[in-house]
Swiss-Prot record:
Gene that produces this protein: hemE
Residue sites binding substrate per the record: R26, Q27, A28, G29, R30, D76, Y153, S208, H323
NCBIfam families associated with the record: hemE (TIGR01464)
Pfam family, one: URO-D
Pathway where this protein functions: Porphyrin-containing compound metabolism; protoporphyrin-IX biosynthesis; coproporphyrinogen-III from 5-aminolevulinate: step 4/4
Principal cellular location given in the protein's record: cytoplasm
Entry GO CC: cytoplasm
Protein name (database record): Uroporphyrinogen decarboxylase
Enzyme nomenclature, EC number: 4.1.1.37
Length: 352
């Protein structure tokens, strides 16, 4: 056993590890009282995520409470947008709002190439401070939104139930949408490189809304741009593990495996055994406990964790939820999740 690198990083690289690493999407957030107290003092989400002292403090809150094996930057997938010339705000209980949705060629041509060091230096500062603080006790994770999901937000102007506006663009003006997606792919790759250079050891790409696409449209509007991001990042940072997550991914799981990422993060609607069977053996898996289960009993939580880890045996596996932890989740149950996750291999025993 080597302690020269964090457990989660070694697992993500496919090395033999002493136990299954565990972290949680959205592990810093509204379910924690310390976060809610801080939010009451700083009600602007953008201030909380763009002030480096606040972002660092929030990123560290779950580590100080639960000691997960990964500490993820507290930020948002839309954080790079202003650096490209797209302003946004995040309204509590309503979500993101884009002041001027991007729907014309002139708007797309006016977008700026992202220069993260100039437009969002707070991200680099926080990642560096996190690395310094956690050392080898946890891996530092960075993340981005994938091109399709970013496009969905900026074209729709807000969260959507049916994505009618961006789908209208996709099917009426596909060349226009491809120009936007290509701009995002280049900028997001630049942003990921910046995160890695600043201290991120593992990075995750969220294509949250790609599950709204048919498989054929996924192949046209999402997968090529996911792959473009991966190819660009891997060309300069080949040893940094990359994770891909899509909410509602059951219909495109095999396609996700062809994007060049190292790990596929499964949502809870895919059985872990089925997910492993549908993906090439060289790919790792992450997940995939239903976040709603954390409203249940400790016994139920432990049972599902054991089930997920047992079914992932033989693969490189990072234990996580199948989606972000939900607001209102009892903190004691989050603690059960982390404590069980760290002990799950002992609960299962040595049987494969």
């Amino acid at each position: 056993m080597s302690d020269s690198q964090p457990l989660l990083l070694r697992a993500a690289r496919g090395e033999s590890v002493e136990r299954t690493p565990v972290w949680m999407m959205r592990q810093a957030g509204r379910y924690m009282k310390v976060y809610r107290d801080l939010r009451d003092r700083y009600p602007s989400f953008r201030e909380r995520s763009e002030n480096p002292d606040l972002s660092y403090q929030i990123s560290m809150q779950p580590f100080e409470a639960f000691q997960p094996d990964g500490v993820i930057l507290f930020s948002d997938i839309l954080t790079p947008l202003p650096g490209m010339g797209i302003d946004f705000d995040i309204v509590e209980s309503k979500g993101p709002l884009i002041q001027k949705p991007i729907r014309s060629l002139s708007q797309i041509e006016a977008l700026q190439p992202l220069e993260p060091n100039a437009t969002m230096p707070f991200v680099g500062e926080v990642l560096g401070r996190l690395r310094e603080s956690v050392g080898n006790r946890a891996a530092v994770l960075g993340f981005v939104g994938a091109p399709w999901t970013l496009a969905a937000y900026v074209v729709e102007g807000k969260s959507s139930k049916n994505y009618a506006v961006i789908k209208a663009m996709a099917f009426q003006q596909p060349d226009l949408l491809h120009r936007l997606l290509n701009h995002f792919a280049e900028s997001i790759a630049t942003y990921l490189r910046y995160q890695i250079d600043s201290g991120a050891q593992v990075v995750q790409m969220f294509d949250s809304w790609a599950g709204q696409l048919s498989p054929a449209d996924y192949d046209t509007f999402a997968a090529p741009y996911q792959k473009r991001v991966v190819d660009l990042v891997k060309s300069t940072h080949p040893d940094t593990p990359m994770i891909l997550y899509i909410s509602g991914s059951a219909g495109v799981l095999e396609r996700m495996g062809r994007t060049g990422v190292d790990i596929i993060s499964l949502d809870w609607t895919v059985d872990m055994a089925d997910g492993c069977a549908r993906l090439p053996e060289h790919l790792g898996v992450q997940g995939n406990v239903d976040p709603g289960l954390l409203f249940g009993t400790p016994e139920a939580i432990r049972e599902r964790i054991v089930d997920a880890v047992r079914k992932a045996r033989g693969r490189r596996h990072i234990l996580n939820l199948g989606h972000g932890i939900l607001p209102g989740t009892p903190e004691d149950n989050a603690k059960v999740f982390f404590e069980t996750g760290k002990n799950v291999d002992n609960l299962i025993g040595s049987a494969a």
